[in-house]
């Protein structure tokens, strides 16, 4: 799977360091952080702007902060056993609430289950020095140089071929995810990691859930700007079509270098998308609740805008695909497999090189009300699976 000859690589500009994890602030430094030995020299503590990273000795300098988000600091390091540069995400105070603990455990299990070129690879879950009392979890992933959010905010030139190749890779990864009966539920530019060679990988599966057979579909999902209309209208039995809507929004943001629907709140978000795709017909209201139908009916009727006229810089075939993705009725929305086979992506599409997951992911952990101690033990066992020769009992 290679980009076309016209798809230029992303430039590496000097010492610029870009967050490789969803982040609210980029940290740039070329200063080596000194370490302090702990636990009889088995671990080394690094102070990254007031955040203590306690890493096994195999993770060698340079230890550098590369991003900061709600979960804390992300740093880069070198795995001395493989000589690979890695990204280490520290999730702090994981067991303060069961939602965060479950989200962390779910993400670890999903990343272990997945094996795909367009999904970020997990390398390690660092074994805590103390089995029964650790509060922080460190997840180690392959290091990617950029994320799409920061790339779109930068001066980096992106061509139409970049947009096509990114769209293809997102859909290729999503096909694999959906084939495992998993919905990502939080697709957005900051959850799409990029390399200098334009390779794209999907990350952050903490909000992922099973496809509709599950009865656990009511938790908050999807950053507002990328949220499908059925979610904005309170549907709790949504399908994989919500991810397709998000991809359509992301693609148009790549092509136009600005968000497609930058809603200020839930009401404004719905207004913005209806101003573009028009007020839905009675048939399109489909399986929405009666309350949602009444709400739509009382809104001013809005005509559908011409995508071609509004976005003249976007190729006609791309417009055709996006219109099929941004369809109000999720039952009429194009599927990932159909999107991959769309003529716009014909230069990349190869069904023999678009693998599916060999078996569905088991979401059994969502059915159990685990205690803090049980979550701690389950996450420790995940770390032990990566480090079978070590046990810090």
From Swiss-Prot:
Keywords per UniProt: ATP-binding, Kinase, Nucleotide-binding, Phosphoprotein, Serine/threonine-protein kinase, Transferase
Active site, per annotation: 186 (proton acceptor)
Stored SUPFAM superfamilies: Protein kinase-like (PK-like)
SMART domains assigned to the protein according to its UniProt record, in alphabetical order: S_TKc (SM00220)
Extent of motif TXY: 218-220
Lineage: Eukaryota, Viridiplantae, Streptophyta, Embryophyta, Tracheophyta
InterPro entries with a match to the protein in the record: Kinase-like_dom_sf, MAP_kinase, MAP_kinase_CS, Prot_kinase_dom, Ser/Thr_kinase_AS
Keyword Kinase: yes
Residues recorded as bearing Phosphothreonine in the entry: 218, 223
Phosphotyrosine PTM positions: 220
Description of its domains: The TXY motif contains the threonine and tyrosine residues whose phosphorylation activates the MAP kinases.
Record text on activity regulation: Activated by threonine and tyrosine phosphorylation.
GO MF annotation, one: ATP binding
Name under which the protein is recorded: Mitogen-activated protein kinase 10
EC number: 2.7.11.24
Transmembrane is among the record's keywords: no
PTM (free text): Dually phosphorylated on Thr-218 and Tyr-220, which activates the enzyme.
Family: Belongs to the protein kinase superfamily. CMGC Ser/Thr protein kinase family. MAP kinase subfamily.
Every Protein kinase domain range: 60-345
Reactions mediated catalytically: L-seryl-[protein] + ATP = O-phospho-L-seryl-[protein] + ADP + H(+); L-threonyl-[protein] + ATP = O-phospho-L-threonyl-[protein] + ADP + H(+)
Residues that span the membrane, as ranges: none
Gene Ontology biological-process annotations: auxin transport; xylem and phloem pattern formation
Subunit relationships: Interacts with MKK2.
Binding locations of ATP: 66-74, 89
């Amino acid at each position: 799977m290679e980009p076309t000859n016209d798809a230029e690589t992303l430039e590496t500009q000097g010492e610029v360091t870009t967050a490789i994890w969803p982040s609210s602030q980029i940290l740039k430094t070329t200063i080596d952080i000194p370490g302090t030995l702990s636990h009889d020299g088995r671990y080394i503590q690094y102070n990254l702007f007031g955040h203590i990273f306690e890493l096994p000795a195999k993770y060698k300098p340079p230890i550098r902060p590369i991003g900061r988000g709600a979960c804390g600091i992300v740093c880069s390091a070198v795995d001395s056993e493989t000589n690979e540069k890695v990204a280490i995400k520290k999730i702090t105070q994981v067991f303060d609430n069961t939602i965060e603990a479950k989200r962390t455990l779910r993400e670890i299990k999903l990343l272990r289950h997945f094996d795909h070129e367009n999904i970020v690879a997990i390398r390690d879950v660092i074994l805590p020095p103390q089995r029964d009392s650790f509060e922080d979890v460190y997840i180690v992933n392959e290091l990617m140089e950029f994320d799409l959010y920061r790339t779109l905010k930068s001066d980096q030139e992106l061509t139409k071929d970049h947009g096509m190749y990114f769209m293809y890779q997102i859909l290729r990864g999503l096909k694999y995810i959906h084939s495992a009966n998993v919905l990502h539920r939080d697709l957005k530019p900051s959850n799409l990691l990029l390399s200098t060679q334009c390779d794209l990988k999907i990350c952050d599966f903490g909000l992922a859930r099973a496809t509709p057979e599950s009865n656990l579909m009511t938790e908050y999902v999807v950053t507002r700007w990328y949220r499908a209309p059925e979610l904005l209208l309170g549907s709790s039995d949504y399908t994989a079509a919500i991810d397709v809507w998000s991809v359509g929004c992301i693609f148009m943001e790549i092509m136009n270098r600005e968000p497609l629907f930058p809603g200020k709140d839930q009401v404004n978000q719905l207004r913005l998308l209806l101003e573009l795709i028009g007020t839905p017909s009675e048939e399109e209201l489909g399986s929405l609740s009666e309350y949602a139908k009444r709400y739509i009916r009382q809104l001013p009727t809005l005509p559908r805008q011409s995508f071609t006229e509004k976005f003249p810089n976007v190729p006609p075939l791309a417009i055709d695909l996006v219109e099929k993705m941004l369809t109000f009725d999720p039952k009429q929305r194009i599927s990932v497999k159909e999107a991959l086979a769309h003529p716009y992506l014909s230069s990349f599409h190869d069904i023999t090189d678009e693998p599916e997951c060999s078996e569905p992911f088991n979401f059994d952990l969502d059915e159990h009300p685990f205690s803090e101690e049980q979550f701690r033990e389950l996450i420790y066992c995940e770390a032990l699976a990566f480090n079978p020769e070590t046990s810090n009992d």
